[in-house]
């Protein structure tokens, strides 16, 4: 603690300097906040929120992994289509064969073989053969057609799930961008606050040396400065945490972030229209609806097991050295097979019942997801309206806190206010600055949340400077592929 021995009075010069200080303090803190205002002009080399969202859209590992899942799901369609196509097989065999044959001849009257005869024949052959078989399913209870439609619905559901992930990543990127701006602005406010409190302590020491205040006033100033320093350290730690999360989500370290603005212009203008859009277009809802389609088709696929199966088969076979008597043999065949299931243990009936229950579960899930989407819209809408009102209130709070601090400082010079009053007024101004920073942060974040809730938070809707990923490109590349093990990307 500073003692009275090293406190030098400043007399009239000190009093004149004290009277002028509130203006400089307010300008310093106000300028720091103004530099962060969302309406401030952007620097030429500043990183914009659109650029950050574009980086996350291209590089986020969760989003890229979900795209790979969609490509994997695309392959279920050609797998299902394979049921329409013929199956071709080729076979070949070769071996070494030793045979012993005993031929018995019946008696022939009037010849030397009146008693009959038995002849033993030993043989050695090396038989080999080759052939081919083609089969085609003609009817299987429409299981193939339903499998194709189910696979197509699964692809559609996977695409909607990709939209869910895209919205999640873009919302996370927008939120961390605003968190970074908020925490950087808060750190600057805390730094200015410490500088102000440090000067306040110096002035209080000088007034104490002049006999104008007591040691209690000095202790109050010291306590407030220590509290300000603690808040500064906490703000520094929070900024470091936010920087790490920014890199995790966006893919690069944050640097020179430009001010951001609300995107509510892309959202519906009324709550009712937002609810209608969210319950119809939110990708979580549409993905659940495709889930119902898949479940219904699974019922039809299971019912197909009760129908007859009709297949056609053709084969050719060439054999050499099958035996001594027939050194060469060629066979060909064409058959049509009809299989009618009569009773298969009851498993197919259980499968049908289970799939019908799955339909009910999926329908309930749609209702649940739609209710959640509605709640998300209402929540985001309320948060956006609250943030807009909070900005107006915080702006009035800042103006009033500035006037109050000016008045308290001036009144303190004539003994009408104590040091504690000055410290309280300074803290009130800091709180007002923080309230405005948080309100501006919340308005931007809640506007992105509203877009996500109504299903409009996408790179295409935001017109981000990035090439939009189009899942249909890969789908068309593999849908009708009959052969080939390499993926369209070359893997």
Predicted regions located by residue number:
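Small/polar-residue-enriched beta-strand and adjacent coil segments characteristic
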Residues: 48, 87-165, 286-369, 376, ...
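Solvent-exposed polar/charged
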Residues: 82, 248-251, 304-305
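Acidic, low-complexity, intrinsically disordered peripheral segments
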Residues: 3-11, 96-98, 438-491
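Bacterial Sec-pathway N-terminal export signals of envelope proteins
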Residues: 42-93, 99-100, 137, 254-293, ...
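Periplasmic alpha-helical coiled-coil/stalk elements that build and connect Gram-negative outer-membrane
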Residues: 2-7, 12-13, 17, 166-279, ...
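Amphipathic alpha-helical coiled-coil segments
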Residues: 65-80, 165, 169-189, 199, ...
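C-terminal segment of classical bacterial N-terminal signal peptides
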Residues: 32-43
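Sec-dependent N-terminal signal peptides
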Residues: 17-32
């Amino acid at each position: 603690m500073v003692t009275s021995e090293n406190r030098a009075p400043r007399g009239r010069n000190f009093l004149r300097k004290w009277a002028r200080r509130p203006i400089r303090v307010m300008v310093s803190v106000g300028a720091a906040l103004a530099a962060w205002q969302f309406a401030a002009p952007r620097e030429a080399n500043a990183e914009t929120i659109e650029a950050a969202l574009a980086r996350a859209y291209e590089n986020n590992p969760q989003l890229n992994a979900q795209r790979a899942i969609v490509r994997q799901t695309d392959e279920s369609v050609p797998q299902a289509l394979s049921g329409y196509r013929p199956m071709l097989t080729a076979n070949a065999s070769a071996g070494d064969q030793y045979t012993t044959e005993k031929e018995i001849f019946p008696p022939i009257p009037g010849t030397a073989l009146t008693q009959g005869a038995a002849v033993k024949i030993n043989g050695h052959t090396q038989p080999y053969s080759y052939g081919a078989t083609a089969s085609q399913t003609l009817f299987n209870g429409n299981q193939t057609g339903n499998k194709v439609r189910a696979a197509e619905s699964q692809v559609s559901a996977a695409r909607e799930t990709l939209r869910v992930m895209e919205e999640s990543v873009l919302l996370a990127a927008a939120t961390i961008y605003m968190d970074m701006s908020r925490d950087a602005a808060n750190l600057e406010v805390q730094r200015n606050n410490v500088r102000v409190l440090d000067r306040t302590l110096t002035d209080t020491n000088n007034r104490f040396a002049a006999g104008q205040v007591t040691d209690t006033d000095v202790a109050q100033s010291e306590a407030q400065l220590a509290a300000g320093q603690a808040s500064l350290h906490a703000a520094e730690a929070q900024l470091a945490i936010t920087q790490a999360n920014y890199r995790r989500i966006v893919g690069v370290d944050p640097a020179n972030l430009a001010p951001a603005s609300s995107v509510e212009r892309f959202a519906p203008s009324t709550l009712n229209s937002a609810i209608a859009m969210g319950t119809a277009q939110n990708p979580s809802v549409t993905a659940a609806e495709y889930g119902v389609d898949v479940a219904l088709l699974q019922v039809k696929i299971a019912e197909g097991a009760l129908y007859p199966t009709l297949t056609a088969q053709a084969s050719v076979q060439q054999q050499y050295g099958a035996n001594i008597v027939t050194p060469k043999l060629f066979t060909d065949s064409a058959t049509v097979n009809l299989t009618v299931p009569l009773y298969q243990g009851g498993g197919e009936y259980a499968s049908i019942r289970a799939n019908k229950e799955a339909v009910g579960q999926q329908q309930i899930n749609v209702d649940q997801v739609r209710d959640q989407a509605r709640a998300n819209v209402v929540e985001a809408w309320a948060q956006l309206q609250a943030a807009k009102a909070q900005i107006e209130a915080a702006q009035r709070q800042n103006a009033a806190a500035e006037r109050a601090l000016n008045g308290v400082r001036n009144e303190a010079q004539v003994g009408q206010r104590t040091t504690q009053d000055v410290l309280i007024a300074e803290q009130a101004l800091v709180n007002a600055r923080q309230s405005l920073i948080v309100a501006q942060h919340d308005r931007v974040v809640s506007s992105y949340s509203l877009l996500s809730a109504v299903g409009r938070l996408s790179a295409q809707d935001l017109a981000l400077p990035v090439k939009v990923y189009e899942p249909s490109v890969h789908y068309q590349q593999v849908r009708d592929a009959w052969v080939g093990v390499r993926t369209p990307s070359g893997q």
